[in-house]
Amino acid sequence: MALKKPENMHYEEAIDELENIVNHLEVGDLALEDALKQFERGIALARSNNQKLQKAQQQVNILMQQDAQAPLQEFNDE
C-alpha cells in the first residue's frame, strides 16, 4: 500500500502514523536504512501537521478579528 502524502492526510491520521513511527524507532529493531526512512517520514508528517496548526491558528485569529465585540477571556485549565 502506498503511503499518503502528509499534506493529504487529516491531522489525526498523521498523528497516529507519527506515534507508530516513534514506537518503531524507540524499539530499535529497524535496520539503519529503514530507521532513516521512518525518521524522514516522521519529519515530513510533523512539518505538515505544524503547517496545519498554523493555518488553523490564522483562521481562529481572523474569526476573532471579525467578531471584535466578543471579549477574550483567559484560558484556565484547572
From Swiss-Prot:
GO molecular function: exodeoxyribonuclease VII activity
UniProt keywords, alphabetically: Cytoplasm, Exonuclease, Hydrolase, Nuclease
Predominant localisation class: cytoplasm
InterPro entries xref list: Exonuc_VII_S (IPR003761), Exonuc_VII_ssu_sf (IPR037004)
Disulphide-bridged cysteine pairs: none
EC number: 3.1.11.6
Superkingdom of origin: Bacteria
Compartments, record wording: Cytoplasm
GO biological process: DNA catabolic process
Single GO cellular component term: exodeoxyribonuclease VII complex
Catalytic function, reaction form: Exonucleolytic cleavage in either 5'- to 3'- or 3'- to 5'-direction to yield nucleoside 5'-phosphates
Enzyme class, UniProt record, top EC level: hydrolase
Subunit-structure text: Heterooligomer composed of large and small subunits.
Function: Bidirectionally degrades single-stranded DNA into large acid-insoluble oligonucleotides, which are then degraded further into small acid-soluble oligonucleotides.
Family of this protein: Belongs to the XseB family.
HAMAP family: Exonuc_7_S
Protein name: Exodeoxyribonuclease 7 small subunit
Organism of this sequence: Psychromonas ingrahamii (strain DSM 17664 / CCUG 51855 / 37)
Lineage, opening ranks: Bacteria, Pseudomonadati, Pseudomonadota, Gammaproteobacteria, Alteromonadales
